[in-house]
């Protein structure tokens, strides 16, 4: 049976395991309260540019 040649740090171990978890989890989306489009949480809406109830980018609502 194979034995490790050197100790693997927790950081290196967790980086390796993160690749599996990144592939298995589905992307989470929330509905923008301003325009109703699906968007990523904790980020400005790509459609209307609003975040936390205020305009943060130069886009305007096309509705």
From Swiss-Prot:
Keyword Ribosomal protein: yes
Organism superkingdom: Bacteria
Ranges for region Disordered: 1-20
Keyword Ribosomal protein assigned: yes
Gene Ontology CC terms: large ribosomal subunit
A biological-process GO annotation: translation
NCBIfam families recorded: rpmF_bact (TIGR01031)
Family: Belongs to the bacterial ribosomal protein bL32 family.
Identification of the protein by name: Large ribosomal subunit protein bL32
Native source organism of the sequence: Chlorobaculum tepidum (strain ATCC 49652 / DSM 12025 / NBRC 103806 / TLS)
């Amino acid at each position: 049976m194979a034995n490790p040649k050197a100790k693997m740090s927790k950081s290196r171990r967790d980086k390796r395991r993160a690749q599996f978890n990144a592939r298995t989890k589905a992307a989470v989306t929330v509905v923008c309260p301003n325009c109703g489009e699906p968007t990523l949480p904790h980020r400005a809406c790509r459609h209307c540019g609003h975040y936390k109830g205020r305009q943060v980018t130069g886009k305007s609502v096309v509705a």
